Amino acid sequence: MEELQGYLEIDRSRQQHFLYPLLFQEYIYALAHDHGLNGSIFYEPMENFGYDNKSSSLIVKXLITRMHQQNHVILSVNDSNESIFVGHNKNFYFQMVSEGFAVIMEIPFSLRLVSSLEEKEIAKSHNSRSIHSIFPFFEDKLSHLNHVSDILIPHPIHLEILVQTLHCWIQDAPSLHLLRFFLHEYRNSNSLITPKKSISLFSKENQRFFLLLYNSHVYECESVLVFLRKQSSHLRSTSSGTFLERTHFYGKIEHLVVVLRNDFQKTLWLFKDPFMHYVRYQGKSILASKGTHLLMKKWKSHLVHFWQCHFYLWSLPDRIHINQLYNHFLYFLGYLSSVRLNTSVVGIQMLENSFLIDTSINKFETLVPIIPLIGSVAKAKFCNVSGHPISKSVRADSSDSDIINRFGRIYRNLSHYHSGSSKKQTLYRIKYILRLSCARTLARKHKSTVRAFLKRLGXEFLEEFLTEEEQVLSLIFQRTSSPSYRSHKERIWYLDIIRINDLANHS
């Protein structure tokens, strides 16, 4: 306990108490513009919003002043979308403040991460950031396990929980008050958070801001797993996550251990399971074990109880599904993963005797589901719900090469992301859809038929369109067998993919 107290004292000294004044600094919004997430409002031309770059800090200052005034007309629920700043949409100001607020809130987290990496001497590896690195882990571990739990992490039932979560990390009272006021007013003024709907944690308009809130919330939910992993002698590991440590963590865990010892003395052994593995991406997590079904049910019960009692999160039991790996497809990150028993017969010749031996090996397989992927492509209007390619509307000044490059880039990104599939038939189907959709789009632009357009363009269109992936694979896997066969069977995991492809995200 003395060691923990010493850690807490050091951690308190690192807390940031003067973050609020940074909201009025111009360079904060320049950082939000330069390093924001794709799809952020700051990636759009500022002139589209009638916005002068040089006056950004003045606008933010005026907005925050209005927010703190008793009569905050700009945020009134009964107002229209136009604020008192003539010509500016009020949602734009919310996005400005949220982007800047997210940049500021990331400062203490970044400092803790750098400090933790230095203390634990963890090398900064970009490969560990890739979500594709999860699947080699699956290949190595899942084939030896028995049961898996699909877990949907519960959402906070009240906005105040999000504020209190950040309060454990940051003790800057003005910033927290602004965050609380900002969240409630944003919800009440045609925002992304409405009383009738759950919190939109992955808003396209405020990705950086809500990802910050969501990651801190999820880390709280996972804290019991982090603690138990550190306590078990069989589960020694070093984490490289962004939210590595947090204030008041051990205070809550100490109380949890007391509760467990008083109420569940006979079941503490389950936390020592040496074959438990945990993986998460966004709101979905996976808990896999070599233990029995009863063990997994106990884990499920304790997780639900922990979330409800210590974080006031109401998690329904049906949000955690327990299945056997051998007869269940695990849907994760756009892949259907499973463990299959492959049986092979080996002939052995020993002097005058020969005999056959049956060998069985557990093999990890990953497939791309065709129906959800076609649904995503249809939603993007490349085909109808039946998978029949259709033309897309394009700008009149778009050149043919730009259109072809756009369709080619979409397919290459999909093929790049789904390169780990055990079977490539789904990708070939998507390739056919996108290629014919491109041809229909070009034919529509030139007021011609697809056949006449392809005849005029020649066979170079088919050779040049979307063949880069197959060419790369054929160069990598030059074997005695045909390249097409090798590219059909080989799985490749790329370690430069840090987010799920939009078309691959069918959830």
Swiss-Prot record:
A GO molecular function held by the record: RNA binding
Subcellular location as annotated: Plastid, Chloroplast
Short name of any one Pfam family annotated for the protein: MatK_N
GO cellular component, one term: chloroplast
InterPro entries: Domain_X, Maturase_MatK, Maturase_MatK_N
Keyword tRNA processing among record annotations: yes
Gene Ontology biological process terms, A to Z: mRNA processing; RNA splicing; tRNA processing
Taxonomy, superkingdom: Eukaryota
Keyword match Chloroplast: yes
Keyword annotations of the record: Chloroplast, mRNA processing, Plastid, RNA-binding, tRNA processing
Entry similarity comment: Belongs to the intron maturase 2 family. MatK subfamily.
Function: Usually encoded in the trnK tRNA gene intron. Probably assists in splicing its own and other chloroplast group II introns.
Protein name, as recorded: Maturase K
UniProt source species: Magnolia alba
Gene name in the database record: matK
